[in-house]
UniProtKB/Swiss-Prot annotation:
GO molecular function, one term: DNA binding
The protein's name in its UniProt record: Uncharacterized protein MG353 homolog
Recorded superkingdom: Bacteria
InterPro entries listed in its UniProt record: Hist_DNA-bd, IHF-like_DNA-bd_dom_sf
Species: Mycoplasma pneumoniae (strain ATCC 29342 / M129 / Subtype 1)
Length: 109
């Protein structure tokens, strides 16, 4: 796997596609098509089952419902009813958690 240079900006989609195309020898257009299909597949899985396991040990996406609640409006002071809301939650895999623990933060001593 090719090591990427550290820069202030994350890789763009096209840069990721280029890196994968060079590493695998597959055309960039085909890589883009594969990612489109993967996106559709994961979204369909998430909608139908509320849980989606990401490939290659990346983690898991799941839909949870935030409970309804009553919240005070700070401007008027009246109590407002906030309805339940679906949220997408990401649970990273153990590998990602371990890798993130090794990252040196720029604000750390």
């Amino acid at each position: 796997m090719e090591k990427t240079t550290t820069s202030s900006k994350p890789l763009s989609r096209s840069e990721i596609n280029k890196i994968i195309a060079v590493a695998t020898g597959v055309k960039e257009a085909k890589i883009k098509e594969i990612f489109k299909y993967l996106n559709t597949l994961l979204l369909n899985e998430l909608v139908s089952r509320s849980v989606c396991i990401l490939p290659e040990n990346l983690g898991k996406l799941r839909i949870t419902i935030r409970n309804a609640r009553i919240q005070k409006d700070m401007k008027t002071g009246e109590m407002k009813h906030i309805p339940p809301k679906p949220l997408v939650r990401y649970s990273p895999s153990k590998t990602i958690k371990e890798t993130a623990a090794k990252v040196r933060w720029k604000y750390a001593d």
